[in-house]
Amino acid sequence: MNLIGACWMRRSLDEPVSALFIDDNHNIIAGGWDGRLAKWNASGDLLWSVELPDRVGSIAANENGIYATAGLHLSALNSENGALMWQHPLEGSADIVTTVDGLVYATSSVYDIEHNDFIDSAIWCFDLAGSQLWVKHMPERPWTLDELDGNLYLGLGRPKMGVAQVSSGGDVEHKALDSNSSVTASVNF
């Protein structure tokens, strides 16, 4: 079967794609393994392309901008032209980003090769201007970061596993699950 014939649009980032996001206007925002971030409109026209410090791990967007984790950094870009609005280094690898109620949340993690495991993780909160409001450290690595009904949830790995609910003020409440497995994927419609 030739899948190319079934495609309505084909665009190249000129590097392997590491993250993909479709915004509310059906624009496609793609990030690559070498740090390129590009935005196409719903018709497939390239609107802009920029270079970030490292591999793009996660992308989020709202009416105020586009947010991406790239290597050790969280970056905020102008949605219209891709201009960098602000950028912050996080502790360890910048992993996941999302926006909820006018705030930008990101997770980071530190991996120790000797222990062959994650030794520290954090959830960060920034306002839209890029000011850090708070950071909370935890021993579990957050594998997912999702909003549901105005609440922010983390899917957790070892040692506690399960789910954590995070308030806008930074309170983290662990919720155990029946399973003793890490929560590494989620679906939010």
Language-model features, listed with the residues they occupy:
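A short helix->beta-strand "capping" segment at the edge of beta-propeller domains
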Residues: 1-15
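A structural motif specific to WD40 beta-propellers
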Residues: 8, 45-49, 83-86, 133-134, ...
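Repeated scaffold domains used in trafficking and secretory/extracellular systems
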Residues: 15-21, 54-63, 91-101, 138-149, ...
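Conserved beta-strand element within WD40/beta-propeller blades
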Residues: 29-31, 67-69, 106-107, 154-156
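WD40 beta-propeller blade core
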Residues: 38, 75-76, 124, 162-164
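Short loop/turn segments that connect beta-strands within beta-propeller blades
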Residues: 41-45, 78-82, 126-131, 167-170
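Short, solvent-exposed loop/turn segments at conserved positions within beta-propeller repeat blades
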Residues: 68-69, 113-120, 157-161
